[in-house]
């Protein structure tokens, strides 16, 4: 009988879970309170820091507590153009400037927004990776809904009361720089999770992977498997509707002409 394959081991967690010990904290918007619902609250950017394992930088923003004589520290995902010492305004009556947090219903059509709430009060769920942004497409004042275009290109209808940060997430173009050597890849994934180096199944022994073994590296059987396949065999193209090249596309048409 073969061994427990890599996919089964990853499903159990253990050494494959994310490394969060050195993370700076969970970057979120402020908790929705009376000040944000009816006016605005002012904060100041104290520092912009690097979060290990995250491509986007984080901004440390200090707010005065509206009810107690104390300062509240918040961690925001830094948009492009934010700087230390900048004043950040959060609330319904905030102005449309980079770094400010306001409801998407108060933003004009075409506004670039990031760290967008999916549900009211969840403190930011969408468009959070480096270089990502969503675009406000249109509003429906009667239904109090706003249509936005997500980084994937999908269009989503959200409540107009959902908050978002104006601007593009900083760190864009990060993946354009080539890694060039294995040492950099090692350090990149060391702070993320145990997923590197990635060994191909055909390069393994038959006891370790269904694609392993043989006098030369080849799968030796159909790589498509059904959805209900047992866990130790469920590798390759899982429940594929079709395989192979997509013929008749733009690239094929250009070659023919």
From Swiss-Prot:
<dbReference type="InterPro" id="IPR002171">
    <property type="entry name" value="Ribosomal_uL2"/>
</dbReference>
<dbReference type="InterPro" id="IPR022666">
    <property type="entry name" value="Ribosomal_uL2_RNA-bd_dom"/>
</dbReference>
<keyword id="KW-0687">Ribonucleoprotein</keyword>
<dbReference type="Pfam" id="PF03947">
    <property type="entry name" value="Ribosomal_L2_C"/>
</dbReference>
<keyword id="KW-0963">Cytoplasm</keyword>
<dbReference type="Pfam" id="PF00181">
    <property type="entry name" value="Ribosomal_L2"/>
</dbReference>
<dbReference type="GO" id="GO:0019843">
    <property type="term" value="F:rRNA binding"/>
</dbReference>
<dbReference type="InterPro" id="IPR014726">
    <property type="entry name" value="Ribosomal_uL2_dom3"/>
</dbReference>
<dbReference type="GO" id="GO:0022625">
    <property type="term" value="C:cytosolic large ribosomal subunit"/>
</dbReference>
<dbReference type="InterPro" id="IPR022671">
    <property type="entry name" value="Ribosomal_uL2_CS"/>
</dbReference>
<feature type="region of interest" description="Disordered">
    <location>
        <begin position="210"/>
        <end position="231"/>
    </location>
</feature>
<keyword id="KW-0689">Ribosomal protein</keyword>
<keyword id="KW-0699">rRNA-binding</keyword>
<comment type="similarity">
    <text>Belongs to the universal ribosomal protein uL2 family.</text>
</comment>
<dbReference type="InterPro" id="IPR023672">
    <property type="entry name" value="Ribosomal_uL2_arc_euk"/>
</dbReference>
<dbReference type="GO" id="GO:0002181">
    <property type="term" value="P:cytoplasmic translation"/>
</dbReference>
<dbReference type="InterPro" id="IPR008991">
    <property type="entry name" value="Translation_prot_SH3-like_sf"/>
</dbReference>
<dbReference type="InterPro" id="IPR022669">
    <property type="entry name" value="Ribosomal_uL2_C"/>
</dbReference>
<dbReference type="GO" id="GO:0003735">
    <property type="term" value="F:structural constituent of ribosome"/>
</dbReference>
<dbReference type="InterPro" id="IPR014722">
    <property type="entry name" value="Rib_uL2_dom2"/>
</dbReference>
<dbReference type="InterPro" id="IPR012340">
    <property type="entry name" value="NA-bd_OB-fold"/>
</dbReference>
<keyword id="KW-0694">RNA-binding</keyword>
<protein>
    <recommendedName>
        <fullName>Large ribosomal subunit protein uL2</fullName>
    </recommendedName>
</protein>
């Amino acid at each position: 009988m073969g061994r427990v394959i890599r996919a089964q081991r990853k499903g159990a967690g253990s050494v494959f879970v994310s490394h969060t010990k050195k993370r700076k904290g969970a970057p979120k918007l402020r908790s929705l309170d009376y000040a944000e619902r009816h006016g605005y609250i002012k904060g100041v950017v104290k520092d912009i820091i690097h979060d290990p394992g995250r491509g986007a930088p984080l901004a440390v923003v200090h707010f005065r507590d509206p009810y107690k004589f104390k300062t509240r520290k918040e961690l925001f995902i830094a948009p492009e153009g934010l700087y230390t010492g900048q004043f950040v305004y959060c609330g319904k009556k905030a102005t449309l400037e980079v770094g400010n947090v306001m409801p998407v219903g108060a933003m004009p059509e075409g506004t670039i927004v990031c760290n967008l709430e999916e549900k009211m009060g969840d403190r930011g769920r969408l468009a959070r990776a480096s270089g990502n942004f969503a675009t406000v497409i249109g509003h429906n004042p009667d239904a109090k809904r706003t249509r936005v275009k997500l980084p994937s290109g999908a269009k989503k209808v959200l409540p107009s009361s959902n908050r978002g940060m104006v601007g593009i997430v900083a760190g864009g173009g990060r993946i354009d720089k080539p890694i060039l050597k294995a040492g950099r890849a090692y350090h990149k994934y060391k702070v993320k999770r145990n997923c590197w180096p990635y060994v191909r199944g055909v390069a393994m022994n038959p006891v370790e992977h269904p694609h392993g073994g043989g006098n030369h590296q080849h799968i030796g059987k159909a790589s498509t498997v059904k959805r209900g396949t047992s866990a130790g065999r469920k590798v390759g193209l899982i429940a594929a509707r079709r395989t192979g090249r997509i013929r008749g596309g733009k690239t094929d048409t250009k070659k023919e002409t």
